[in-house]
């Protein structure tokens, strides 16, 4: 209402006509360049005032449809991904981040992995009961399988691929491998996010240095974008991401058709191994 008063400083808002109010709303987007979310708030406020409070049965409200802001995901180049992975300080988090990037996994998916979810004979990672309750399989390179096998052999936890050492393991006098081996809980989301933030800050990529946020989910965006840039089918990429339709995958788009063999070849050449 404040902005409406500024646009019509000498008019009673209750005396404004339909066209005047609708033209004002359109000007917020086209002339003032306000964000779509801000314009939508103004639409809702004025609709409540004129339609619900004053009872104005204007037909023009149906014409005001402001699309939500569509922000493209933050994507690192391959070189930047390699720099990021090279800056991770602890081996267990390096294994997590490498797997997230190479397989496009959500944070919740990677920390929930069990050793048996890595099918070395078929070269796939099985994601069980992911978002939407769907299972899926994602190809994984032999080099990454060997790296994960070597990491697991350091702790040999029978239940979790990435177990949590638990709080106070250092003060208890345990070694990290022993703490991981005895753990009954998976690595926590917060510990992975903390390792991500520490690495981002160490690289100077945090918000204080003018970059958009780099988060765990950024690695999933990189996975999708780098596959599409290499010509892998959007249908395969959507399948690997676990999307229920192609629509959410289209945000990454620019692609040509390629076979799963091409996808495996591209994945084998991802940096970090």
Task: Spell out what each predicted region is.
Residues 1-273:
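Conserved catalytic core of the tyrosine transesterase superfamily
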């Amino acid at each position: 209402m404040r902005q409406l008063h500024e646009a019509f400083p000498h008019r009673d808002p209750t005396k404004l006509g339909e066209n005047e109010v609708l033209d004002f709303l359109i000007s917020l987007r086209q002339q003032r360049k306000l964000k779509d979310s801000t314009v939508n708030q103004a639409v809702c406020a004025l609709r409540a005032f004129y339609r619900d409070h004053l009872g104005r049965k204007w037909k023009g409200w149906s014409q005001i449809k402001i699309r939500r802001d569509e922000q493209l995901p933050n994507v690192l180049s391959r070189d930047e991904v390699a720099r990021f992975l090279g800056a991770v300080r602890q081996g267990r988090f390096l294994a997590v981040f490498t797997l997230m990037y190479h397989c496009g996994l959500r944070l919740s998916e990677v920390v929930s992995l069990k050793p048996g979810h890595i099918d070395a004979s078929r070269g796939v990672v099985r994601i069980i009961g992911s978002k939407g309750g769907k299972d899926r399989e994602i190809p994984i390179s032999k080099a990454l399988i060997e790296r994960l096998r070597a990491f697991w052999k350091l702790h040999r936890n029978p239940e979790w691929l990435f177990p949590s050492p638990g709080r106070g393991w250092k003060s208890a006098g345990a070694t990290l491998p022993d703490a991981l081996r005895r753990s009954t809980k998976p690595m926590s989301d917060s510990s992975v996010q903390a390792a991500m933030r520490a690495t981002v800050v160490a690289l100077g990529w945090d918000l204080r240095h003018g970059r958009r946020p780099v988060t765990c989910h950024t690695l999933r965006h990189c996975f999708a974008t780098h596959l599409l840039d290499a010509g892998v089918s959007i249908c395969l990429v959507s399948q690997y991401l676990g999307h229920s339709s192609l629509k959410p995958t289209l945000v990454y788009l620019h692609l040509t058709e390629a076979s799963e063999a091409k996808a495996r070849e591209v994945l084998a050449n991802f940096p970090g191994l």
